[in-house]
């Protein structure tokens, strides 16, 4: 069905995808990431602006409006989330499918964001963010029909989106944990922050959907779909590289 994440009308073009092309592209992207990521200051995928850090550290008590604003701001600047969602939406044509997949992602990252911060569940942030980078690689590879073409099977896309959503939320939770938020009004503030994230996500997705809808009307959309997802995959490898180097540098 055309509404599936890997669109049949793209597959019917029988685009020739050579494994060596994917391997070389991934290797080059990962090498560039390793070189760039050696500057540890660039490693934070969920970095918080200096001014925002000051608010998080000094705020005491419930602050619904500011936390909603900061949540929405994070979504607009969270390039890892946006890249993954672009991959998820790339071949979704029906509104019902868009709602389904976005809801699964939202459920996943909302659960781990709240559980991670409110219950203090912790993990190495570099490992979590590397998995987030992997989620971008996965979705681009899925859009290119890589699993069926090269591995002979097709993962459950809905389960994958939900699972990776858990890691995306946990990645944000690890960042907030480092800020030692005040316990006073924490539940209200985290719920407000999460609502803000969802508002920001809706606004960002509206822009993505408008751009994709316009692009799909162009004659060259299907022709350029493979290259677009190859670039998306490269972006995922770069995100992974940042975090892998960060883990190695901090472990040494």
Q: What are these regions, as identified by a protein language model?
A:
Residues 16-77, 153, 241-252:
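Histidine-/acidic- and/or cysteine-rich, low-complexity loops and terminal segments associated
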Residues 73-79, 84-251:
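Hydrophobic alpha-helical transmembrane segments in multi-pass membrane proteins
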């Amino acid at each position: 069905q055309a509404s599936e994440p890997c669109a049949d009308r793209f597959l019917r073009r029988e685009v020739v995808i050579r494994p060596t092309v994917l391997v070389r592209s991934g290797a080059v992207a990962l090498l560039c990431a390793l070189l760039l990521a050696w500057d540890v200051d660039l490693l934070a995928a969920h970095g918080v602006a200096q001014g925002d850090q000051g608010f998080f550290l000094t705020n005491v008590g419930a602050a619904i409006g500011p936390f909603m604003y900061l949540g929405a701001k994070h979504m607009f600047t969270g390039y890892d989330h946006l890249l993954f969602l672009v991959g998820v939406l790339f071949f979704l044509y029906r509104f019902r499918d868009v709602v389904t997949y976005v809801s699964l992602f939202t459920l996943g990252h909302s659960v781990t964001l709240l559980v991670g911060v409110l219950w203090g569940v912790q993990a190495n942030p570099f490992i979590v963010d590397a998995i987030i980078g992997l989620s971008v690689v996965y979705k681009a590879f899925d859009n290119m029909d890589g699993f069926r073409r090269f591995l002979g099977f097709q993962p459950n896309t809905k389960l994958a989106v939900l699972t990776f959503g858990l890691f995306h939320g946990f990645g944000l939770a690890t960042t907030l944990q480092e800020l030692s938020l005040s316990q006073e009004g924490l539940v209200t503030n985290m719920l407000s922050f999460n609502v803000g994230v969802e508002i920001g996500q809706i606004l960002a997705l509206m822009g993505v959907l408008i751009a994709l809808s316009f692009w799909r009307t162009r004659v060259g959309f299907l022709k350029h779909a493979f290259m677009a997802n190859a670039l998306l995959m490269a972006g995922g490898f770069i995100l992974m590289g940042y975090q892998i180097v960060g883990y190695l540098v901090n472990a040494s």
